Amino acid sequence: MAKVFEGHLIGEGLRFGIVVARFNEFITHKLLSGAQDALIRHGVAENDIEVAWVPGAFEIPLVARRMLARNRYDAVLCLGTVIRGGTPHFEYVASEVAKGVAKVGLETGTPVIFGVITADTIEQAIERAGTKAGNKGWQAAVSGIEMANLVRRLESSS
C-alpha cells in the first residue's frame, strides 16, 4: 500500500507570518480578521502570529520573502485585494502577485499561501471577504495550517 502524507488542521506549536496589503483596507482588514480568527480557533497562540502591512498587493511577495528570511515561521499568509478597473493594470498586478507569492514558496520551501482576492467588482471582493462567499483570509489560514503540518510530516519522514 502506498504511503500517504496529509497535513492536519492542528495549529498548536506553529508560527505564522501574515502580509496584508493596505490598499482596499476596508476589505483586507476583514481578511486579516478572518485569518487570525481561524489560526487561533485551530490552536495557534496569538503571540505566534506576526503581521506586516504593505502599501498594496504588488509589495506582498517581497515582504513575504523578507519575513521568511528570519526563519521564524512555519508558513506565511499573503492577503490583499485586486479589483478590476478600466485599464489592464488589474491583469499585471494580479498576475505578478500570484507569480511572486508562488516563487517565494518554491524558493524557500516554506508554505506561502495566496489569500489575495481578485475580483471584477468591489461587491464581489466584499462578498469574498466574509459576507456571502466565505472569508478568503480564513481559507488562507486553514490552508496554511494544513500545508505547514504537511511539510513537517514530509521533513520528518526522510
UniProtKB/Swiss-Prot annotation:
Keyword Membrane annotated: no
Record keywords: Riboflavin biosynthesis, Transferase
Name this protein carries in UniProt: 6,7-dimethyl-8-ribityllumazine synthase
Catalytic activity: (2S)-2-hydroxy-3-oxobutyl phosphate + 5-amino-6-(D-ribitylamino)uracil = 6,7-dimethyl-8-(1-D-ribityl)lumazine + phosphate + 2 H2O + H(+)
Active-site residue numbers: H89
GO biological process: riboflavin biosynthetic process
Function text: Catalyzes the formation of 6,7-dimethyl-8-ribityllumazine by condensation of 5-amino-6-(D-ribitylamino)uracil with 3,4-dihydroxy-2-butanone 4-phosphate. This is the penultimate step in the biosynthesis of riboflavin.
Enzyme class: transferase
Pathway noted in the entry: Cofactor biosynthesis; riboflavin biosynthesis; riboflavin from 2-hydroxy-3-oxobutyl phosphate and 5-amino-6-(D-ribitylamino)uracil: step 1/2
Entry's family note: Belongs to the DMRL synthase family.
A GO cellular component annotation in the UniProt record: cytosol
NCBIfam families referenced in this protein's UniProt entry, alphabetically: lumazine-synth, PRK00061.1-4
InterPro entries recorded: LS, LS/RS, LS/RS_sf
Binding site for 5-amino-6-(D-ribitylamino)uracil: F23, A57, F58, E59, T81, V82, I83, F114
GO molecular-function terms, A-Z: 6,7-dimethyl-8-ribityllumazine synthase activity
Source organism of the structure: Desulforudis audaxviator (strain MP104C)
The EC number(s) this enzyme carries: 2.5.1.78
Binding site residues for (2S)-2-hydroxy-3-oxobutyl phosphate: G86, T87, R128
